């Protein structure tokens, strides 16, 4: 992966958006220069609906040669959907992160946290927000899925959140 290749993919798939593309390419170039493309700080893309945030996340994944999946936070109202449910419960299963990591076959996906701004509108979003903070922390090596009950290393995952409104 080179900056030129990334730039070509982003330019080919997104007309305009120059400041956003330049910012991402700046981040990529610093990470490549430091050989740290895996340790990527979480990023927030915000703007009105329909400007291309979701497709831009897909293009970033393509430019980095990574698989991607989306978590629709706007409709998420149960923390167990993120964190999984203990195996001792009936119909227990891993959380959405682990299910998708398993489905994609990689611990290095681009994870799209869609509509992160909608969390505040959920009646009991505080537990979900706490789980997200834990996942997005700089030390992402100890994410606990309740179903597996072992620490999961998410340090190679890239988290990109999108929001329509950040106020």
Language-model regions: role of each:
Residues 38-41, 64, 83, 104-109, ...:
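Short loop/turn elements that form and flank the Walker-type P-loop nucleotide-binding site
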Residues 74-77, 88, 116-119, 164-167:
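Conserved nucleotide-binding/hydrolysis micro-motifs of P-loop NTPases
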Residues 88-112, 145-151:
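Conserved alpha-helical scaffold flanking the Walker A/P-loop in AAA+ ATPase domains
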Residues 47, 84, 115:
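The Walker A (P-loop) glycine that initiates the GxxxxGKT/S ATP-binding motif of P-loop NTPases
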Residues 36-73, 102-103:
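Walker A/P-loop
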């Amino acid at each position: 992966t080179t900056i030129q290749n990334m730039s070509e993919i982003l330019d080919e798939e997104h007309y305009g958006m120059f400041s956003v593309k330049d910012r991402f390419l700046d981040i990529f170039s610093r990470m490549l220069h430091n050989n740290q493309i895996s340790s990527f700080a979480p990023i927030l893309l915000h703007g009105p609906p329909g400007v291309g945030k979701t497709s831009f996340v897909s293009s970033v994944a393509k430019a980095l040669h990574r698989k991607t999946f989306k978590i629709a936070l706007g409709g998420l109202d149960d923390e167990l959907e993120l964190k999984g449910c203990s195996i001792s419960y009936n119909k227990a299963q891993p959380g959405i992160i682990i299910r998708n990591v398993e489905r994609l076959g990689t611990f290095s996906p681009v994870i799209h946290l869609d509509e992160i701004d909608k969390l505040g509108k959920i009646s009991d979003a505080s537990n979900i927000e706490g789980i997200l903070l834990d996942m997005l922390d700089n030390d992402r090596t100890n994410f606990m899925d309740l179903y597996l009950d072992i620490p999961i290393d998410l340090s190679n995952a890239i988290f990109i959140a999108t929001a329509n409104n950040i106020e």
